[in-house]
């Protein structure tokens, strides 16, 4: 890894106003996907997230609850970090703006700008929203309240929150001084703001009409960072909050090595705070003599059919509910695949369940199940590239190369949905390849053995590549794919990913489906009920309607009565010479003499002596058969198979040997 191959990505720091819903998780997962991708591409990566913990709103809320702000904040900070853990977020640092190092660095930066005359003391009079922690002019208000005389008494901010009139002494930042510089910077760095439409909004709506100076401090509350030279002022939230992206790296501290190493980086934000990040933030950095971020990417909102998520609307989706019922990877996949990053997207339970069934269960899950089954069935679990190709191999390998190339291009442009669509193009093409080559037909002829093995290799290798590309999005799923393909590796670098891996171990036996199919009607109803805050009633049990999961045809009770099941105590057990699968049991099954049974379970019981004294369940009236030329097996030991493992069936110790089962 070269020293300058670094990557720094940040989420906005979240405001601790209660339980985070799926929208906040959306941003954090997107940044995590990008961070994981860059690490797999060999970049020294640093991923920052955290909480914005100062301000009037927090102070008021804590006072209402009879708590200090810190007492109010600490449990919420712990809850957010626990949620990120559930979402498998691989952040490198979690910043809280109440951290001492951050407060000290912000205070130093403020004093520097004050000395440079970029900040001056003045008086502010205007409309302020406590909820938004933002000042508004009358023209910016969505609605204005007036008294009988026509005087303005209040109003509604664009966010829907009420504003109040504020008059107080404040320090201002000379934003207008840097307006021309900022426009020139935009021109010289056309990719600085993404998507492009966000830049046009900033230029036309805020900069060209005249950039107003920005209030930086408040005196009407105390929960903030005091200005060292005038402690009755506390630093206003946006100067405090924006600097977190560099203070977390050690800026203005005794150890700024990470700052020198990683800055500038990429700030990922929601479109509602794009103005603060694309106008105020680069100007503040420029005034401090620091480079602007490499890029500000302002993504869209995750909406419901009836607009933004809101408890009052009964349409809030919490990620914990989805993870608990459908698994983390299904949630991460849906958010990154169903929504074009940068645009608004709509979450619907129907689309969510449909994606799981069609994309994950049908396309990916089915391909893995079929591939593992055929490799075990037709080639004893071995994956071999024989070089005897079919007429479809060249076009398939071409799709692999195109998929890898397109995937990297999409990831570099933050087009996560496009990157996943590329992977599914490969998965779909590989499913088609099975139908084209018909391995079950090739298996009928020994002459086609080499061609069959080559087909199986292509299936396994395409799954490996798909699994590798899915690592940033669905780490656990990738691991399951690698495991079922019998691979020791649980992670693959993406730097030089290409077709042609050498498989060295047998494929494991087919496990449980990685994504079981869902009952659409039932799951959609469940999600909608949870969104409304309800509890799903237990489904009435109707035995006659239960679909039995059977692998063999049903038998009549008369047939079952022909089988005699007994309890047998293990007296002795030893490996059978010349076989690595068989164990030879000497059993007390209530007969006049001990009986002998040979069972192919040696690989599951490397210490076979642990079975001595156990009381097993056996089929006692199975016709004796000769095995290994010199042994007679007088029955069958019953066992259960699960996840590629096997366990003998036992009974309680106080059940006598020879007891009938049934």
From Swiss-Prot:
Matching InterPro entries: Anticodon_Met (IPR041872), Met-tRNA-synth_bsu_C (IPR004495), Met-tRNA_synth (IPR014758), Met-tRNA_synth_2 (IPR023457), Methionyl/Leucyl_tRNA_Synth (IPR015413), MetRS_core (IPR033911), NA-bd_OB-fold (IPR012340), Rossmann-like_a/b/a_fold (IPR014729)
Residue ranges of domain tRNA-binding in the record: 559-662
Motif 'KMSKS' region, chain ranges: 308-312
Sequence motif: 'HIGH' region, positions: 14-24
GO MF annotations in UniProt: ATP binding; methionine-tRNA ligase activity; tRNA binding
Recorded coiled-coil stretches: none
GO cellular component: cytoplasm
Transmembrane segments: none
UniProt keyword terms in alphabetical order: Aminoacyl-tRNA synthetase, ATP-binding, Cytoplasm, Ligase, Nucleotide-binding, Protein biosynthesis, RNA-binding, tRNA-binding
Positions that bind ATP: 311
Cellular compartments annotated: Cytoplasm
EC number: 6.1.1.10
Biological process according to GO: methionyl-tRNA aminoacylation
Main location: cytoplasm
Entry keyword annotation includes Membrane: no
Family annotation (HAMAP family): Met_tRNA_synth_type2
Function of the molecule: Is required not only for elongation of protein synthesis but also for the initiation of all mRNA translation through initiator tRNA(fMet) aminoacylation.
Protein family per UniProt: Belongs to the class-I aminoacyl-tRNA synthetase family. MetG type 2B subfamily.
Protein name per its UniProtKB record: Methionine--tRNA ligase
Natural source organism: Lactococcus lactis subsp. lactis (strain IL1403)
């Amino acid at each position: 890894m070269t020293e300058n191959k670094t990557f720094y990505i940040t989420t906005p720091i979240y405001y601790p106003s209660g339980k985070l819903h799926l929208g906040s998780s959306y941003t954090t997962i997107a940044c995590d996907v990008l961070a994981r991708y860059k690490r797999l591409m060999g970049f020294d990566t640093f991923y920052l997230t955290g909480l914005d913990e100062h301000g009037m709103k927090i102070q008021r809320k804590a006072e209402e609850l009879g708590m200090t702000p810190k007492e109010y904040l600490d449990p919420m900070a712990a809850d957010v970090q626990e949620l990120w853990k559930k979402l498998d977020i691989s952040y490198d640092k979690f910043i809280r703006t109440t951290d001492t190092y951050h407060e000290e660095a912000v205070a130093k930066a403020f004093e520097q700008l004050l000395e440079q005359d970029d900040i001056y003391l003045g008086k502010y009079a205007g409309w302020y929203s406590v909820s938004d922690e933002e000042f508004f002019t009358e023209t910016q208000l969505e609605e204005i309240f007036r008294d009988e005389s026509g005087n303005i008494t209040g109003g509604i901010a664009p966010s829907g929150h009420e504003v109040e009139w504020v008059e107080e002494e404040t320090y201002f930042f000379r934003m207008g001084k840097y307006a021309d510089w900022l426009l020139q910077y935009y021109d010289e760095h056309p990719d600085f703001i993404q998507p492009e439409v966000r830049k046009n909004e900033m230029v036309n709506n805020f900069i060209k009409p005249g950039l107003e100076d920005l209030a930086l401090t408040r005196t009407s509350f105390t929960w903030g960072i005091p200005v060292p030279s005038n402690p009755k002022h506390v630093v206003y939230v946006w100067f405090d909050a924006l600097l977190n992206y560099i203070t977390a790296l050690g800026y203005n501290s005794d150890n700024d090595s990470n700052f020198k190493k990683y800055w500038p980086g990429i700030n990922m934000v929601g479109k509602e705070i794009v103005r603060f990040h694309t106008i105020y933030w680069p100007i503040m950095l420029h005034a401090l003599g620091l480079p602007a971020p490499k890029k500000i990417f302002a993504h869209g909102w995750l909406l419901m059919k009836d607009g933004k998520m809101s408890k009052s609307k009964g349409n809030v989706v919490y990620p914990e509910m989805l993870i608990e019922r459908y698994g983390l990877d299904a949630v991460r996949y849906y958010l990154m695949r169903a929504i074009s990053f940068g645009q608004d997207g709509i979450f619907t339970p129907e689309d969510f369940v449909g994606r799981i069934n069609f994309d994950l269960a049908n396309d990916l899950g089915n391909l893995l199940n079929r591939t593992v089954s055929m490799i075990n069935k037709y080639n004893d679990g071995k994956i071999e590239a024989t070089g005897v190709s079919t007429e479809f191999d060249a076009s398939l390998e071409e799709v692999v190369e195109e998929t890898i190339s397109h995937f990297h291009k999409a990831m570099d442009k933050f087009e996560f949905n496009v990157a996943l669509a590329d992977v599914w193009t490969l998965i779909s093409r590989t499913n088609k390849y099975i139908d084209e080559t018909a391995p079950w037909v090739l298996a009928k002829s020994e002459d086609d053995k080499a061609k069959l093995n080559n087909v199986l290799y292509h299936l396994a290798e395409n799954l490996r590549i798909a699994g590798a590309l899915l690592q940033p999005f669905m780490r656990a799923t990738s691991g399951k794919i690698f495991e079922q393909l019998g691979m020791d590796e649980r992670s693959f670098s993406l730097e030089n990913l290409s077709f042609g891996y050498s498989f060295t171990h047998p494929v494991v036996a087919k496990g449980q489906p990685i994504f079981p199919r869902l009952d659409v009607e039932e799951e959609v109803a469940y999600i909608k009920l949870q969104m409304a805050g309800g509890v799903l009633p237990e489904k009435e049990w109707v035995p006659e309607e239960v679909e039995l999961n059977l692998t063999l045809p049903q038998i009549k009770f008369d047939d079952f009565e022909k089988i005699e099941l007994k309890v047998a105590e293990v007296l002795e057990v030893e490996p059978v010479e010349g076989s690595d699968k068989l164990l030879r049991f000497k059993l007390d099954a209530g007969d006049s003499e001990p009986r002998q049974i040979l069972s192919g379970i040696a690989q599951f019981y490397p210490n076979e002596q642990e079975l001595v004294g156990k009381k097993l369940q056996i089929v006692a009236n199975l016709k004796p058969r000769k095995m290994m030329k010199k042994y007679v097996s007088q029955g069958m030991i019953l066992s259960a198979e699960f996840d590629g493992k096997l366990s003998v069936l036992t009974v309680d110790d106080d059940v006598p040997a020879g007891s009938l089962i049934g």
